Curated annotation (Swiss-Prot):
Known role: Component of chylomicrons, very low-density lipoproteins (VLDL), low-density lipoproteins (LDL), and high-density lipoproteins (HDL) in plasma. Plays an important role in lipoprotein metabolism as an activator of lipoprotein lipase. Both proapolipoprotein C-II and apolipoprotein C-II can activate lipoprotein lipase.
Family of this protein: Belongs to the apolipoprotein C2 family.
GO terms for MF: phospholipase activator activity; phospholipase binding
Organism this protein belongs to: Tupaia glis (Common tree shrew)
Official protein name in the record: Apolipoprotein C-II
Biological-process GO terms, alphabetical: lipid catabolic process; lipid transport; positive regulation of phospholipid catabolic process
Residue span of region Lipid binding: 66-74
Region annotation (Lipoprotein lipase cofactor) ranges: 78-101
Entry-linked Gene3D superfamilies: Apolipoprotein C-II (1.10.1440.10)
Length: 101
């Protein structure tokens, strides 16, 4: 799952890096207007959506049902064990606090 996250992060940074490399002559020292901010927000939103779609598509392609089933099985077994040991710990704690009466 870490590699998927890194790949998605790489795609986002690549898309943003390509957007940042603009023509130096087109840069101006004017304050940002509301229309420019709206355009930048829309551009960022579209790039984010495309990166998200690419990451989702990559996840769909690399999805392994056997691994997912193993993870679900390990989760259910570990939660059952934790529940059992938490109950034992709670009983021991109550018996220590209550003492012998």
């Amino acid at each position: 799952m870490g590699t998927r996250f890194l790949l998605a992060l790489f795609l986002v940074l690549l898309v943003l890096g390509l957007e940042v490399q603009a023509d130096p002559e087109s840069r101006q020292d004017e304050p940002a207007s509301p229309a420019l901010l709206a355009q930048m927000r829309e551009s960022f939103s579209s790039y984010w959506d495309s990166a998200k779609a690419a990451a989702q598509d990559l996840y769909q392609k690399t999805y392994l049902p056997a691994v997912d089933e193993r993870i679900r099985d390990m989760y259910s077994k570990s939660t059952a064990a934790v529940t059992t040991y938490a109950g034992i710990f709670t009983d021991q704690l109550f018996s220590m606090l209550k003492g012998e009466q």
